[in-house]
Amino acid sequence: MADLLSSLKNLSHSSGVYQYFDKNRQLLYIGKAKNLKKRIKSYFSIHNNEITPNHRASLRIQMMVKQIAFLETILVENEQDALILENSLIKQLKPKYNILLRDDKTYPYIYMDFSTDFPIPLITRKILKQPGVKYFGPFTSGAKDILDSLYELLPLVQKKNCIKDKKACMFYQIERCKAPCENKITKEEYSKIAKECLEMIENRDKLIKELELKMERLSNNLRFEEALIYRDRIAKIQKIAPFTCMDLAKLYDLDIFAFYGASNKAVLVKMFMRGGKIISSAFEKIHSLNGFDTDEAMKQAIINHYQSHLPLMPEQILLSACSNEALKELQEFISHQYSKKIALSIPKKGDKLALIEIAMKNAQEIFSQEKTSDEDLILEEVRSLFNLECVPYRVEIFDTSHHSNSQCVGGMVVYENNAFQKNSYRRYHLKGSNEYDQMSELLTRRALDFAKEPPPNLWVIDGGRAQLNIALEILKSSGSFVEVIAISKEKRDSKAYRSKGGAKDIIHTPSDTFKLLPSDKRLQWVQKLRDESHRYAINFHRSTKLKNMKQIALLKEKGIGEASVKKLLDYFGSFEAIEKASEQEKNAVLKKRI
């Protein structure tokens, strides 16, 4: 405690970020302050050099303060910089007592550029700095389905560069385009098509009605497979916003955030209203062993959503709850980020309060559906057995694959909300000369990406204690808190025993080794994760090997033998790099003309 007491006596009055650590140097909490000295001292009571938690703090904070042994600070220019740095560090380092919201993606917008002669609908996530652009959104899902439908229902210019080609393409022949490239339609005639496109984007009901008519026509013509495609697309578009029936007399443009939590679970709901109608919505489920802080949740939600410059900002942002201090901070953040005043408020009455109540009702409904399943019970048992600090709600599983140390690849699969999250899977080409170097490269590359993609609760490694130790060293150097276990086959005579029916799995933790019965559900849970990562890595290896064999065959056709191919690969690193290299560069490597 002497180190902590000394740190508390020498605090700066500057703006900055503070980090609390326990006696083992495990990161407990990250916060930010306009005045570091004033903010940090508010956590503690100091009497006769004895440090105790401030009795006015919440029980969650008091419990955390009892564990603090060290603190570190990072000074910045102003409070806005501190707010952004705090959010970035929380995502990267995942402290024990901070809430981590993973959904920080920028939602897509549909736009049309009416400064062009023949405008078409396209998707963007950025602001396009040109006049005449009209945006629609954001869309939390279904933007591509809307776009595909528009191009199939209307004879729009089908590609951005079509006009430059000056020659009608296949789309004209199948009556999906009017061929303005050959002047077969005037700008005035096309503007009517663009106007109808605009109406379908703004009026989802009209779009769905047209899709239903097309589906019926296909069905009547016995084209059932195509009709099924339209049926599925209609269902997706109808799901984009379950609140589209809600229509306010006032043409509000609002973003609405509602947070509801209890015990160790919470839900954040986001709704987006444009022109008085809810056009899309999204929600995120959050888990925490140490309770929730509404201010912290709202701050993360707002910063995650608005830190990238969005094409279409609302007139006002509505929050379900937030302290005055946090509201002021967020207001300053938005004003600074967008150089204009966009009000943040907590409605107390009227139709805006009704919108918050609807968002809260949906958050509570989603929360109530989160019943404890058998899988949740297994997660608790896994935590207890392997002495994990956190329930492994989100898990990343790693495996490598190679053939005689060639075509070395790695795969990462992700398990969350009791299901494999295939959109989060990642594949890696590796350079290591052995399985340990390959695993080290795979895990290092993942750890370097923590700032963009926050770390999980748990890593599962396909390997033994050596691979486990590699993972622990990498995580230690990253500064992020992620727990690790590894699973390997039982070895006999220093070899993995894999004969049918005899392969026993061993689970390694930093402090123990477990040999569980094949019927143990905790072992089966880890095996399920390992098997999926193994399948994913093997499939990637096979596809890489097949692709390489085809590329080797193509080079052989050019008179380049296997030895020369190996030289080129060793030098350039990939077939793609070989193809991009000039003749002079390849000649220099091979010392002969190719």
Swiss-Prot record:
<dbReference type="InterPro" id="IPR047296">
    <property type="entry name" value="GIY-YIG_UvrC_Cho"/>
</dbReference>
<feature type="domain" description="GIY-YIG">
    <location>
        <begin position="13"/>
        <end position="99"/>
    </location>
</feature>
<dbReference type="Pfam" id="PF22920">
    <property type="entry name" value="UvrC_RNaseH"/>
</dbReference>
<keyword id="KW-0267">Excision nuclease</keyword>
<comment type="function">
    <text>The UvrABC repair system catalyzes the recognition and processing of DNA lesions. UvrC both incises the 5' and 3' sides of the lesion. The N-terminal half is responsible for the 3' incision and the C-terminal half is responsible for the 5' incision.</text>
</comment>
<dbReference type="InterPro" id="IPR010994">
    <property type="entry name" value="RuvA_2-like"/>
</dbReference>
<protein>
    <recommendedName>
        <fullName>UvrABC system protein C</fullName>
    </recommendedName>
</protein>
<dbReference type="GO" id="GO:0006289">
    <property type="term" value="P:nucleotide-excision repair"/>
</dbReference>
<dbReference type="GO" id="GO:0009432">
    <property type="term" value="P:SOS response"/>
</dbReference>
<feature type="domain" description="UVR">
    <location>
        <begin position="205"/>
        <end position="240"/>
    </location>
</feature>
<dbReference type="InterPro" id="IPR036876">
    <property type="entry name" value="UVR_dom_sf"/>
</dbReference>
<dbReference type="InterPro" id="IPR000305">
    <property type="entry name" value="GIY-YIG_endonuc"/>
</dbReference>
<dbReference type="Pfam" id="PF01541">
    <property type="entry name" value="GIY-YIG"/>
</dbReference>
<dbReference type="InterPro" id="IPR050066">
    <property type="entry name" value="UvrABC_protein_C"/>
</dbReference>
<keyword id="KW-0227">DNA damage</keyword>
<keyword id="KW-0228">DNA excision</keyword>
<keyword id="KW-0963">Cytoplasm</keyword>
<comment type="subunit">
    <text>Interacts with UvrB in an incision complex.</text>
</comment>
<dbReference type="InterPro" id="IPR001943">
    <property type="entry name" value="UVR_dom"/>
</dbReference>
<keyword id="KW-0234">DNA repair</keyword>
<dbReference type="Pfam" id="PF08459">
    <property type="entry name" value="UvrC_RNaseH_dom"/>
</dbReference>
<dbReference type="InterPro" id="IPR004791">
    <property type="entry name" value="UvrC"/>
</dbReference>
<comment type="similarity">
    <text>Belongs to the UvrC family.</text>
</comment>
<dbReference type="InterPro" id="IPR001162">
    <property type="entry name" value="UvrC_RNase_H_dom"/>
</dbReference>
<dbReference type="Pfam" id="PF02151">
    <property type="entry name" value="UVR"/>
</dbReference>
<dbReference type="InterPro" id="IPR038476">
    <property type="entry name" value="UvrC_RNase_H_dom_sf"/>
</dbReference>
<dbReference type="InterPro" id="IPR035901">
    <property type="entry name" value="GIY-YIG_endonuc_sf"/>
</dbReference>
<dbReference type="GO" id="GO:0009381">
    <property type="term" value="F:excinuclease ABC activity"/>
</dbReference>
<dbReference type="GO" id="GO:0005737">
    <property type="term" value="C:cytoplasm"/>
</dbReference>
<dbReference type="GO" id="GO:0009380">
    <property type="term" value="C:excinuclease repair complex"/>
</dbReference>
<dbReference type="GO" id="GO:0003677">
    <property type="term" value="F:DNA binding"/>
</dbReference>
<keyword id="KW-0742">SOS response</keyword>
